[in-house]
Each structure stands twice: as C-alpha cells, then as structure tokens.
Amino acid sequence: MSKRVFNFYPGPCTLPLPVLQQAQKELLDFEGCGMSVMEISHRSQRFEAILAETLSLAKKLIGAPDDFCVLLIAGGAHQQFAMTALNLLADGGSAGIVNSGLWAKRALEEAQRVGKMVELWRAPDGKCTTLPDLKTLTVPKNLRYVHLTSNETVDGLQFPELPDLGVPLVLDVSSDYYTRPLPWDYCDIVYGGVQKNLAPSGMALVFVRKQCLREHTNLARFFCYKHHADANSLLNTPPTWQIYILHLVLKWIEQQGGVAHFAALAQKRSAKLYDFIDNNDFYRNDVEKKYRSKINVVMRTPSDALDTQFWQEAETHALVGLKGHSAVGGLRASLYNAMEMAGVEALIDFMHDFAQRH
C-alpha cells in the first residue's frame, strides 16, 4: 500500500484506518457469504443484523433517550433542511433560526419554502468571526422550534454550549456529530449528514422525538419521518454500503472510548493548533476565541498568494484538503474524529517550516 496522507478535507472525511482495512478484507466476501456487502439484499438476515446493531449503537453512543427514534435516510443534510420544516411546520406556525453562517443560511432558504421562519440572529455577509450568546437571545415563545447549526465549517465557528432556549431545538450537527454530548432534554430533532465524522456521503443520521412522528397526508411518504420510523429505515432500498461503514465506524468509536474520548481529543487537537497559530506572526485566526471551532480550524497567511502556495505545497508533504472554502478563501484544517494527533503535529511542523521560508 502506498503511503496514506493526512486528510484535512471538510467532507467526505478521513475515516479510521482499521475501518477501511476491515472493509477491504470483507469487500469481496462478507462473512463467508460469497458476496460483497454491497450485493446482499437489504432484506437478508445478514443486512438486517447490520442495520439493527447500527441503529442501536448510534443511539447508545450519543446518549439519545428512549423517547427518540433513530433513522437512516438516503440523501444528506440538505434534504433534512427541508424535511425538518416539512414535518414540524406542516400544520402551520412558525420557527426560529440562528443564521450563523453558510450552512444555517442554506437551512433557512429551504425551510422558508415550507413555512414561516424568524431570523433570531444573522451573521454578517461574507466572513463571519463571531456567534451570538445563545443564553441572552430573545426567543418568542410561540415558535414551534429553533434551528441551530452547531458548527459552521466554512468560517470555523462552533457554539460552545447549546442551552435551553425555551422552545424545542432542531440541531444540525453534521460536522460535530459524536464529538461532544448533546442536550437531548430540549431537542425535538437532531440530524446530520454522515460524511463528516461517520461514513461515506449519501445518507443522513436523524434522531426524532417520538411525539413528533405524525402522519401528514399532504406530504409524500418519503419526506414523512413517521413512515421512515414505521419502516425501520427500510422505506426504500437503503444505502447499504454507507450503513455498513457507519456500523464499523460506530464500533470503532465505542472501542476508542465513546463520545467522551472524542470530545477530549477534539479539545486537545484544536488547542494545539490554535496555540501555534496564536504564538507566531505569520498565521492568524480572526474568530472570537470562545466561538472557535474544535473541528474546523480556519487560518490565513499574510496574503492570498501565500495561502494558495501553502495548500499546494502542503499536498507534496502528504497534507491534503487545506484549501479554505471558496466563499471565504484562506486555509482550513478539518479535524474530524479519525484525525490522529500525528496529523496535527505534521501540519504544525509544515506550518513552521513554511513560515520560516517566507
């Protein structure tokens, strides 16, 4: 095998090497059945066993209470931007949203097609460097829910806490899923695309409070959470390969020590990188410190030209995916669960060398 690189892309994400090796081992012959897991029927006992354990592990590891169901739905977070509103605003009413960046804005745009959305806070156009203090946010009590994007990958922003706002929360945790505990007591829906921390792209992992599962006769069955729950995530032929990899990743998360382990690792990785950025004159991070993301670290060199030279040269040192989002430029290192400390250390070594030469 050729040397693996350190993958800092924002998604699809770097996956744990033991998971990839297990998938490689079983690729042509899963559990001696003579077929790949990509070929076996989703109605077979083998796949139903994978699905059952995946759903069970997903719920157990994230600490979701019994009054939540867990769903695996083909598509991604963009689809959930609409589905959350389609299900929770089907009977009218309005919802709030904290428009904290590009992904919250996308969620707002989709939800507005369905019902009335109230912007409780709006990020400035372009580069955003701060977030609102959620504890002091004015939230009308008549809102059906408030939508929050827990971590904004583009600007490197993350809410350090997700407090009770007095109305139920709908959380998009796509980029920090399974990196920290979640406030289940006041959530109605928690969702995320799996491609950041958990599996290949093409699927969303969704937790819905059971009391929110209702039949909506004016809604296509595929877009109704109740139908997915009633079908045990088998409403249509599911993305079996993504579910299989998710199953392996969840087992790996459990073996490593669960969410508590990865919360500590996220703090350790990001702190090391931010400390290096803050203690030299070549790199800078403009995000207000208390809102800095532990998952997506953004930074800049003294010029756009050097930013480009940095990520291009980094690729020749087995450090890939460091180019910032096209909307804001700069540089970005995505530190998802499978990113080892060795990757951060290698990045810092390169940053030091690059700064010395420029």
UniProtKB/Swiss-Prot annotation:
<keyword id="KW-0808">Transferase</keyword>
<protein>
    <recommendedName>
        <fullName>Phosphoserine aminotransferase</fullName>
        <ecNumber>2.6.1.52</ecNumber>
    </recommendedName>
</protein>
<dbReference type="GO" id="GO:0005737">
    <property type="term" value="C:cytoplasm"/>
</dbReference>
<feature type="binding site">
    <location>
        <position position="43"/>
    </location>
    <ligand>
        <name>L-glutamate</name>
    </ligand>
</feature>
<feature type="binding site">
    <location>
        <position position="195"/>
    </location>
    <ligand>
        <name>pyridoxal 5'-phosphate</name>
    </ligand>
</feature>
<dbReference type="GO" id="GO:0008615">
    <property type="term" value="P:pyridoxine biosynthetic process"/>
</dbReference>
<feature type="modified residue" description="N6-(pyridoxal phosphate)lysine">
    <location>
        <position position="196"/>
    </location>
</feature>
<dbReference type="GO" id="GO:0004648">
    <property type="term" value="F:O-phospho-L-serine:2-oxoglutarate aminotransferase activity"/>
</dbReference>
<dbReference type="InterPro" id="IPR015424">
    <property type="entry name" value="PyrdxlP-dep_Trfase"/>
</dbReference>
<comment type="pathway">
    <text>Cofactor biosynthesis; pyridoxine 5'-phosphate biosynthesis; pyridoxine 5'-phosphate from D-erythrose 4-phosphate: step 3/5.</text>
</comment>
<keyword id="KW-0963">Cytoplasm</keyword>
<feature type="binding site">
    <location>
        <position position="103"/>
    </location>
    <ligand>
        <name>pyridoxal 5'-phosphate</name>
    </ligand>
</feature>
<feature type="binding site">
    <location>
        <position position="172"/>
    </location>
    <ligand>
        <name>pyridoxal 5'-phosphate</name>
    </ligand>
</feature>
<comment type="function">
    <text>Catalyzes the reversible conversion of 3-phosphohydroxypyruvate to phosphoserine and of 3-hydroxy-2-oxo-4-phosphonooxybutanoate to phosphohydroxythreonine.</text>
</comment>
<comment type="similarity">
    <text>Belongs to the class-V pyridoxal-phosphate-dependent aminotransferase family. SerC subfamily.</text>
</comment>
<keyword id="KW-0032">Aminotransferase</keyword>
<keyword id="KW-0028">Amino-acid biosynthesis</keyword>
<feature type="binding site">
    <location>
        <position position="153"/>
    </location>
    <ligand>
        <name>pyridoxal 5'-phosphate</name>
    </ligand>
</feature>
<keyword id="KW-0664">Pyridoxine biosynthesis</keyword>
<dbReference type="InterPro" id="IPR000192">
    <property type="entry name" value="Aminotrans_V_dom"/>
</dbReference>
<dbReference type="Pfam" id="PF00266">
    <property type="entry name" value="Aminotran_5"/>
</dbReference>
<dbReference type="InterPro" id="IPR015422">
    <property type="entry name" value="PyrdxlP-dep_Trfase_small"/>
</dbReference>
<keyword id="KW-0663">Pyridoxal phosphate</keyword>
<dbReference type="GO" id="GO:0030170">
    <property type="term" value="F:pyridoxal phosphate binding"/>
</dbReference>
<comment type="pathway">
    <text>Amino-acid biosynthesis; L-serine biosynthesis; L-serine from 3-phospho-D-glycerate: step 2/3.</text>
</comment>
<comment type="subunit">
    <text>Homodimer.</text>
</comment>
<keyword id="KW-0718">Serine biosynthesis</keyword>
<dbReference type="GO" id="GO:0006564">
    <property type="term" value="P:L-serine biosynthetic process"/>
</dbReference>
<dbReference type="InterPro" id="IPR015421">
    <property type="entry name" value="PyrdxlP-dep_Trfase_major"/>
</dbReference>
<dbReference type="InterPro" id="IPR022278">
    <property type="entry name" value="Pser_aminoTfrase"/>
</dbReference>
<feature type="binding site">
    <location>
        <begin position="236"/>
        <end position="237"/>
    </location>
    <ligand>
        <name>pyridoxal 5'-phosphate</name>
    </ligand>
</feature>
